[in-house]
Amino acid sequence: MATISKEEIKEAIKNMTVLELAELVKELEEEFGVSAAAMVAAAPAAGGAAAGAAAEEKTEFDVILQSPGDKKINVIKVVREITGLGLKEAKELVDSAPKAIKEGVSKEEAEQFKAKLEEAGATVEVK
């Protein structure tokens, strides 16, 4: 039996079409009794656990718009400034309150965003 190096395998895979790669994956799954989908499904679970650990440390905060208040137009302007959204998207976000405006930001940023939104007339919560 001839020994094939990893480099030779990688080169062979690089030269394959998408259809050929799909067939190869199916054949490997059948040959070894595994599923490529199981690996993909396991990856987000690990990411979710890492996110849970970060939330416990409280280094990341979410800015949540509870209510736009009476000055809805001013709040929409501030939401656009903070998020970089277009006018339509910012309006939809404000109309769907309570809603997270920014997620996973530092405490300082969260407090700045909260101050801007409250100055515009909104009711805001930082979690």
UniProtKB/Swiss-Prot annotation:
GO BP, one annotated term: translation
Classification via CDD domains: Ribosomal_L7_L12 (cd00387)
Pfam families hit by this protein: Ribosomal_L12, Ribosomal_L12_N
Domain of life: Bacteria
Keywords, alphabetical: Ribonucleoprotein, Ribosomal protein
Similarity comment text for this entry: Belongs to the bacterial ribosomal protein bL12 family.
The protein's role, per its UniProt record: Forms part of the ribosomal stalk which helps the ribosome interact with GTP-bound translation factors. Is thus essential for accurate translation.
Subunit structure: Homodimer. Part of the ribosomal stalk of the 50S ribosomal subunit. Forms a multimeric L10(L12)X complex, where L10 forms an elongated spine to which 2 to 4 L12 dimers bind in a sequential fashion. Binds GTP-bound translation factors.
Protein known as: Large ribosomal subunit protein bL12
